[in-house]
């Protein structure tokens, strides 16, 4: 597993002076197995390994930047970094603000998790979700009461402390939490498919950068490298 220090620069060729010699990769660092930070302060996860390989294939110098989820799109548009690679599903609403690369994951089923033995009404109950996610929008449309939190860990805590009847999130995120809960938490209800898979967020003005990453993603799909990473990190369906 590749690991890099926070803000460590990858080797490669710079794209152009337009990106100050590096492409800054914005990520949350709080949504394993997609992206996280270990006890040594190093970025880890599926998207970190993926991003490193994409930068290598695109001959780009890249550096990682941590940013909270609730401001991750505004800060991309403000120029704080050049891409978002943070488990962000491609949706029509988000595409009004930013561009996306081609998807690097298939749509991941969303699942509900509740305290084991709990009865949950998905149409009128209280459901926790992370702010600004496709799951939060889905809860609103379902008629249930949405309670939003800035971080995914807070959504789990809301179920444990009784503030929410259940949490909805990507199955790949919830799987290890349920397994490690010692029977305290369980999946409930049916899976829900939302969004068009996950892609890299790019400013609308940076079409050249998007093209470079699209070519790199497609090359990883073609040679099986992307599927290998998806299997390694247990992300979901293969291409």
Residue spans for each PLM region:
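Ligand-binding clefts/hinges and TM-proximal coupling segments of bilobed small-molecule sensing domains
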Residues: 61, 67, 134, 138-154, ...
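A ligand-binding cleft/hinge motif common to bilobed small-molecule-binding domains
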Residues: 71, 88-97, 165-194
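Extracytoplasmic small-molecule ligand-binding "clamshell" domains
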Residues: 21-88
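Periplasmic-binding protein-like
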Residues: 29, 106-111, 175, 179-218, ...
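Sec/Tat signal peptide C-region and signal peptidase I cleavage site
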Residues: 13-22
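Flexible hinge/capping segments at coil-to-helix
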Residues: 109, 113-128
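Short helix-initiation/N-cap motifs at beta->coil->alpha
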Residues: 48, 64-74, 131-132, 147-161, ...
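Alpha-to-beta junction loops
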Residues: 59-61, 77-86, 160-169, 173, ...
């Amino acid at each position: 597993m590749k690991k890099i220090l926070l803000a460590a620069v990858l080797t490669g060729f710079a794209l152009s002076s337009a990106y100050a010699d590096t492409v800054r990769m914005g990520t949350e660092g709080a949504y394993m197995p997609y992206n996280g930070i270990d006890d040594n302060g190093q970025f880890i996860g599926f998207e970190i390994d993926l991003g490193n390989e994409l930068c290598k294939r695109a001959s780009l110098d890249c550096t990682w930047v941590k940013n909270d989820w609730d401001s991750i799109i505004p800060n991309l548009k403000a120029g704080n970094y050049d891409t978002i690679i943070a488990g962000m599903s491609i949706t029509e609403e988000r595409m009004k603000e930013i561009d996306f690369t081609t998807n690097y994951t298939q749509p991941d089923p969303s699942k509900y998790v509740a305290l084991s033995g709990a009865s949950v009404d998905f149409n009128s109950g209280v459901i926790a979700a992370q702010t600004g996610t496709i799951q939060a929008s889905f809860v609103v449309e379902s008629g249930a009461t949405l309670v939003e939190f800035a971080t995914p860990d807070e959504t789990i805590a809301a179920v444990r402390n009784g503030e929410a009847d259940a949490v909805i999130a990507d199955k790949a995120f919830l799987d290890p939490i349920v397994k490690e809960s010692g029977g305290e938490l369980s999946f409930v209800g049916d899976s829900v498919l939302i969004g068009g898979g996950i892609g890299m967020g790019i400013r609308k003005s940076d079409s050249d950068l998007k093209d470079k990453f699209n070519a790199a993603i497609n090359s990883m799909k073609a040679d099986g490298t992307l599927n290998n990473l998806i299997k390694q990190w247990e992300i979901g369906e293969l291409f």
